[in-house]
Curated annotation (Swiss-Prot):
Organism encoding this protein: Campylobacter jejuni subsp. jejuni serotype O:2 (strain ATCC 700819 / NCTC 11168)
Function statement: Involved in the gluconeogenesis. Catalyzes the conversion of oxaloacetate (OAA) to phosphoenolpyruvate (PEP) through direct phosphoryl transfer between the nucleoside triphosphate and OAA.
Name listed for the protein in its UniProt record: Phosphoenolpyruvate carboxykinase (ATP)
Similarity remark: Belongs to the phosphoenolpyruvate carboxykinase (ATP) family.
Alphabetical keyword list: ATP-binding, Cytoplasm, Decarboxylase, Gluconeogenesis, Lyase, Manganese, Metal-binding, Nucleotide-binding
GO cellular component: cytosol
Length: 524
C-alpha cells in the first residue's frame, strides 16, 4: 500500500494492482459489471455516454506548456484552481473503496514510450486499459515509474459546472505540467485511450518525432504502409490484410528508427460486423476481448446488427488476437502513405497520387464525412474537415505535425495517395458507397507498386494525378465525372467541394507554413 501513498487517496479498502486477465474477468463477474457472451467474451454497457465527449475536454493553462498548445474549441483552457478542485473531487470519489491500478506503456519504441498508471474503481475499465495499451513484462512492472497518471472517477460528476463555466457535469482534464489527467462523469472507455493519445501528440513533436492518427501494416518485403483517416473511413478494415502483418490499427509514432504502435490492442467498431467481410476482427472477439454496448440475444450470442444502444458499438482486444500481427509492434520507415476519405459528395476519385506538397495540404485538410455514432449528436454522414485526420487529439498547431510529415516524406522518399472510400456516382443519398472490392484493388495496386507503372491524367480543379486504368477497378470509376449521370450537377458539386476546401484552409493561414501549403489545394 505504501507505494501508492503518492496517489493521494484516503482509506483505500484494497488495491488490485496489475491483475491478470483471469483475475479481471472474475472481478467483473463478481461486481456484476456486465455479461458474458456465448463464447465467454465479457460485454459491458458504458451508460449514457457511448462515444467521447469532446466538448468536455480541457487542458490546464499554465506555463511553459501554454505557449505550445493551440488554444481554441478543441483544446479548451481551464484554470489550475478548477483542475485542483475537480481532481480533489475525483480523489474523494475513489477514496474509501477498492480500486484497480493498471500500469502500462504507450509506445513500442523504447526511446519514445511513456509509462502510464491508470486508477479506476471499475474492473472492466482496468481490463480496457490492459487490452488497449502495451502490457509490460514482469521485470518492467517491478521497475515501473509512471510518467503520467490518469484518475478515472467515472461515477463522479461536477454539479457546479455552470458556475465553473464548463460545458456539462462531465470533465476530462489534462494537466501537462503535473502529468496528471482526471476523468469524471463518463464511463466511456475511449476517453482513456484517446486521452493518452492526446498527450503523446503533445510530447512527441516537441522531441521532433511525429505522432499520427493512423493504422499501419508491413508486407513480406518489410515495406511499411500507413493508413490515415477518421473513425469509420476504413482504417481498421483496410489495414487488416491477410498478406501483411498488422503493426497497429489507430495510433502510431514515427521516430528516427521507423514507425511504432502506441498501443498493444485494437478498438474496432462492431456495428454490422460480418465474419465473411472481416474475419480477422470477428475472430478476435473471444475471451479477454471486451465488448461495449452491443445487444445479446437470449442464447447470449451477439446481435451485431442491433444499434438500439448506439451505432458506435465497439470491441477492444489485445493485438495478439489478430493472428497476423507484427509481434514487435514496430517496423522501419514507410514506403507508402494512404489518406482515406469517405467523401459524402461523391467527387473525390477512388485513388489519386499526391506530391509531397499536396500531401501536406490534404493531411492538414483531413477531409472526410463524419460517420454515425463516433461522437454524440452525429446520426448520418456529414462533410467535415479534421486537421491531420485527428484534430480532436492534436494539442499543438496542426502545421507542426504537417511540417514533420513533410520532412519525413522527403527524407524517406515516401509515396502518398488519397483514396476515397465514400460515395461514387452522386452525393450521399443519390450515389452509392464505393465497393470495398474496388477500394481493396486500389490499395493492392499501391502496396504492390503496380500503380506507379500506370498512365496518369489530371483531375481538374483539384489538380490530382489519377490513373487512366487500374487492374481490378472498372475504368469508368477512376474519374468521378464519368460516374455521374447529371454532368451539370457534378460540376456544381465539384466546385462547391473545392470552395469548402479553400474556405477551411484559411484557418491555417495564421502561420507562414499555412500560407505556403495553401497553394497546393484546389483552384476554382
Amino acid at each position: 500500500m505504501k507505494k501508492f501513498d503518492k496517489l493521494g487517496l484516503d482509506n483505500i479498502k484494497e488495491i488490485f494492482h496489475n491483475l491478470s486477465y483471469d483475475e479481471l474477468n472474475a472481478h467483473e463477474k463478481a461486481n456484476n459489471e456486465g455479461l458474458s457472451t456465448d463464447n465467454d467474451t465479457f460485454c459491458v454497457d458504458t451508460g449514457i455516454f457511448t462515444g467521447r465527449s469532446p466538448k468536455d475536454k480541457y487542458f490546464v493553462k499554465q506555463d511553459p506548456s501554454s505557449k505550445y498548445i493551440a488554444w481554441g474549441k478543441v483544446n479548451q483552457p481551464i484554470t489550475k484552481e478548477l483542475f485542483d478542485k475537480l481532481l480533489t473531487k475525483a480523489k474523494q470519489e475513489l477514496s474509501g473503496k477498492k480500486i484497480y491500478v493498471q500500469d502500462v506503456f504507450c509506445g513500442a519504441s523504447l526511446q519514445s514510450r511513456k509509462a502510464v498508471r491508470f486508477v479506476t474503481e471499475i474492473a472492466w475499465q482496468a481490463h480496457f486499459v490492459k487490452n488497449m495499451f502495451i502490457r509490460p513484462s514482469q521485470e518492467e512492472l517491478e521497475n515501473f515509474k509512471a510518467d503520467f497518471i490518469v484518475y478515472n472517477a467515472c461515477k463522479c460528476i461536477n454539479e457546479d459546472y455552470k458556475q465553473d463555466g464548463l460545458n456539462s457535469e462531465v470533465f476530462v482534464i489534462f494537466n501537462v505540467e503535473e502529468n496528471i489527467a482526471v476523468i469524471g462523469g463518463t464511463w466511456y472507455g475511449g476517453e482513456m485511450k484517446k486521452g493518452i493519445f492526446s498527450m503523446m501528440n503533445y510530447w512527441l513533436p516537441l522531441e521532433n518525432k511525429l505522432s499520427m492518427h493512423c493504422s499501419a501494416n508491413v508486407g513480406e518485403k518489410d515495406d511499411v504502409a500507413l493508413f490515415f483517416g477518421l473513425s469509420g473511413t476504413g482504417k481498421t478494415t483496410l489495414s487488416t490484410d491477410p498478406k501483411r502483418r498488422l503493426i497497429g490499427d489507430d495510433e502510431h509514432g514515427w521516430d528516427d528508427e521507423g514507425v511504432f504502435n502506441f498501443e498493444g490492442g485494437c478498438y474496432a467498431k462492431t456495428i454490422n460486423l460480418d465474419p465473411e467481410h472481416e474475419p480477422e476482427i470477428y475472430g478476435a472477439i473471444k475471451r479477454n476481448a471486451l465488448l461495449e454496448n452491443v445487444v445479446l440475444r437470449a442464447d447470449k450470442s451477439v446481435d451485431y446488427a442491433d444499434a438500439s444502444k448506439t451505432e458506435n458499438t465497439r470491441v477492444s482486444y489485445p493485438i495478439e488476437h489478430i493472428e497476423n500481427h507484427e509481434p514487435s509492434l514496430k517496423a522501419g520507415h514507410p514506403k507508402n502513405i494512404i489518406f482515406l476519405s469517405a467523401d459524402a459528395f461523391g467527387i473525390l476519385p477512388p485513388v489519386s497520387k499526391l506530391s509531397k506538397e499536396q500531401a501536406m495540404y490534404y493531411f492538414l485538410s483531413g477531409y472526410t464525412a463524419k460517420v454515425a455514432g463516433t461522437e454524440r449528436g452525429i446520426t448520418e454522414p456529414q462533410a467535415t474537415f479534421s486537421a491531420c485526420f485527428g484534430e480532436p487529439f492534436m494539442p499543438l498547431h496542426p502545421t507542426v505535425y504537417a511540417r514533420l510529415l513533410g520532412e519525413k516524406i522527403e527524407k524517406h522518399e515516401v509515396n502518398v495517395y488519397l483514396v476515397n472510400t465514400g460515395w461514387s456516382g452522386g452525393s450521399y443519398g443519390v450515389g452509392k458507397r464505393m465497393s470495398i472490392k474496388a477500394t481493396r484493388a486500389c490499395i493492392n495496386a499501391i502496396l504492390d507498386g503496380s500503380i506507379t507503372k500506370c498512365e496518369f491524367e489530371n483531375f481538374e480543379v483539384f489538380d490530382l494525378a489519377i490513373p487512366k486504368a487500374l487492374e481490378g477497378v472498372e475504368s469508368v470509376l477512376l474519374n468521378p465525372i464519368n460516374t455521374w449521370l447529371d454532368k451539370n450537377a457534378y460540376i456544381a458539386t465539384r466546385d462547391k467541394l473545392a470552395h469548402m476546401f479553400i474556405q477551411n484552409f484559411k484557418r491555417y493561414e495564421d502561420v507562414k507554413e499555412g500560407i505556403e501549403f495553401s497553394k497546393f489545394g484546389p483552384k476554382i
